[in-house]
């Protein structure tokens, strides 16, 4: 559906119209439009369409919305622009196109931020994800003095060098929508673009959940259970990687259990974030948990390179 054909779906009027416009723009650039990954992740980068697909030589262009959870960022629904659950729009372009910045500026123009009418600036801000063992050269994009998105040239993911380098674009959808709609409180965002009794706001959709999950994240999440869940996820990740690894009798077969194993890595990461929000992990323990998750991510990344999607074949695996 073309959002521009429906006035109430224009990005300046509706949150969902903003998403549809970005979908339309990046589909026109040749991206596969994917759905959100169905697990609790801290950022769109955790989606295997980015983390795993950025590895290996095969070209890959995709875009998707990803609900993201950062338990420590909850403010019981009382902060106008800080949330423990929010939405990112993620674009991964591999290999990195030479006109990435031009494509990005085109996406801003598509949602109504004409670079000729707004002060668009790129501020150097290299990106790093310790739990994913990932980093890249990056820039924040500021529009009229407010950060609206970031783009990064991946150098490493899962502790593995990216060859070729991928270009990643990340839009904070709530912040971008607040700017486009001209509102100061995220809960006042018009979600569906309608008015009067038909209007649905962001707060009507998400405020109660934000309040309840803040209580859960800071006060009620069962820490004994979470510690067990972390151990279980870590153990299962390694067990699945072992189960899917080629055997000598397989005649150099490819790895067969990467995605289920990576799901367990994602689970371990989210459980760690909940434990961190509950304040039950010391400073020294925190670093240890980060390293444990990173080790899982690295093992998954290495296994992915021994799959067809990762660029391997039976001939290269031999």
From Swiss-Prot:
Keywords, in A-Z order? Aminoacyl-tRNA synthetase, ATP-binding, Cytoplasm, Ligase, Nucleotide-binding, Protein biosynthesis
Its primary localisation, in coarse terms, equals: cytoplasm
InterPro entries per the UniProt record, alphabetical: aa-tRNA-synth_II/BPL/LPL (IPR045864), Gly-tRNA-synth_heterodimer (IPR006194), Gly-tRNA_ligase_asu (IPR002310)
Q: What class does this enzyme belong to in the EC scheme? A: ligase
Where in or outside the cell?
Cytoplasm
Q: What is a single molecular function from GO for this protein? A: ATP binding
Signal peptide range: none
Reaction(s) this enzyme catalyzes, per UniProt: tRNA(Gly) + glycine + ATP = glycyl-tRNA(Gly) + AMP + diphosphate
Instruction: State a single Pfam family of this protein.
Output: tRNA-synt_2e
Q: Would the keyword Metal-binding be found if you checked this record's keyword annotation?
A: no
UniProt family annotation: Belongs to the class-II aminoacyl-tRNA synthetase family.
Its quaternary organisation is: Tetramer of two alpha and two beta subunits.
- Report the protein name in the record: Glycine--tRNA ligase alpha subunit
Give the source species: Chelativorans sp. (strain BNC1)
Lineage at the top is: Bacteria, Pseudomonadati, Pseudomonadota, Alphaproteobacteria, Hyphomicrobiales
- Gene label: glyQ
């Amino acid at each position: 559906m073309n959002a521009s054909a429906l006035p109430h779906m224009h990005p300046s009027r509706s949150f969902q119209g903003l998403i549809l416009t970005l979908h339309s723009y990046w589909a026109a650039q040749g991206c596969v439009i994917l759905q959100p990954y169905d697990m609790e992740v801290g950022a769109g980068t955790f989606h295997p369409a980015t983390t795993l697909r950025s590895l290996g030589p095969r070209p890959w262009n995709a875009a998707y919305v990803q609900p993201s959870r950062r338990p420590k960022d909850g403010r019981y629904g009382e902060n106008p622009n800080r949330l423990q659950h929010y939405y990112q729009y993620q674009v991964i372009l591999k290999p990195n196109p030479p006109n990435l910045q031009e494509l990005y500026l085109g996406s801003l123009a598509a949602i109504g931020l004409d670079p000729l009418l707004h002060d668009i600036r790129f501020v150097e801000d290299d990106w790093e994800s310790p739990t994913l063992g990932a980093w890249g050269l990056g820039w924040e994009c500021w529009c009229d003095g407010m950060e609206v998105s970031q783009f990064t040239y991946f150098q490493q993911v899962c502790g593995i060098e990216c060859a070729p380098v991928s270009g990643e674009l990340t839009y904070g959808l709530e912040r971008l929508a607040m700017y486009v709609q001209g509102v100061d409180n995220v809960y006042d965002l018009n979600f569906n673009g309608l008015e009067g009794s038909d209007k649905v706001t962001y707060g009507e959709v998400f405020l109660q959940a934000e309040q309840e999950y803040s209580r859960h994240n800071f006060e009620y999440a069962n820490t004994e259970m979470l510690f067990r869940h972390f151990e279980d996820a870590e153990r299962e990740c390694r067990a699945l990687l072992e189960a899917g690894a080629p055997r000598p009798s397989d005649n150099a077969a490819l790895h067969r259990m990467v995605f289920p194993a990576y799901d367990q890595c994602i689970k371990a990461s989210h459980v760690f974030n909940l434990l961190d929000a509950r304040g039950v992990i010391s400073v020294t323990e925190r670093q240890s948990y980060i390293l444990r998750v990173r080790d899982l991510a690295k093992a998954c990344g290495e296994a992915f390179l021994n799959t067809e999607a990762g660029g391997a074949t039976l001939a290269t695996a031999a």
